[in-house]
Each structure stands twice: as C-alpha cells, then as structure tokens.
Amino acid sequence: LIAPTTTKKRMKLIVKDSHQLIYQVSNVNITGGKLKSTAKTILNNYKTIKSINPKKHVIIGFGITKDTIGNFKTANGLVIGSACCKVISNAIKKRQNPAKNLNIMLKDLKSRVI
C-alpha cells in the first residue's frame, strides 16, 4: 500500500520490495467516502510511483465513484469495493438480483474508463 502520506523515500522502498502489484490509496478517508484529494494530486502520485518502476502495476482505490472514475483512465486498475458492496446490499434489501444489478453498475463504470 502506498498512501498520500507516504514519503518519496518510503515510496521507493515499497516499489522496490513489492511484487508486481501496488495498491495506491487515493486519499486518507474511510472506505466508501468521497475523495478528499483532487484527481490531479492522485494522478501525480500515480505517475511518481510509475516513474520509480514503470513495470509495476499500480491500482488506485478508496473513494473512486462513478463521478470520479473517468479521471483515472491511465491507471492499471481501479478498486471500487464499497460501491460493489452497496449495490449488492441494496439489491438484497429490495429482493432484486444482486448479480444483475452489479453487472449493470460495472458496465456503466467500465464505459467511463474505456
């Protein structure tokens, strides 16, 4: 994990010692919360990580929503765990098909980054 508060020195160590995947925490917040960092700041951190080792895959997570996801098209991947949990939970409460509702949401999000 690399957080917005991670120093450049520590970032280099994490990238060097990591396997092929690095999780970039987009902001300091609770899961499912709104972004407190700007998309520009998050992308600058992403570019810094990639500049240390371009071969590492970096996924961005924490605060990614349908309104912000389009800003992160250059990322190797995005984590939207809380959004998925909300869709599943709401579908169950409404006695709807969670898989169908999740598929609809994921197609919408995918269309915003491709």
Where are these regions (language model features)?
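Hydrophobic faces of well-ordered beta-strands that scaffold small-molecule active sites
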Residues: L1-I2, I22-Q24, K56-F62, L78-I80
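Active-site-proximal loop/turn and secondary-structure-junction residues that shape catalytic pockets
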Residues: P4-T6, V28-N29, I64-K66, C84
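Catalytic cores of alpha/beta
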Residues: T6-K16, I52-N53, I60-L78
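Active-site-adjacent beta->alpha loops and helix N-cap segments on the catalytic face
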Residues: T6-L13, T31-T48, D67-G70, S89-K100
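Glycine-rich phosphate-binding active-site loops on the catalytic face of alpha/beta enzymes
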Residues: Y23-G33, T74-K94
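Surface-exposed amphipathic alpha-helices with a cationic face
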Residues: I42-P54, L106-I114
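C-terminal helical cap(s) of enzyme catalytic domains, especially alpha/beta-barrels
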Residues: A83-I114
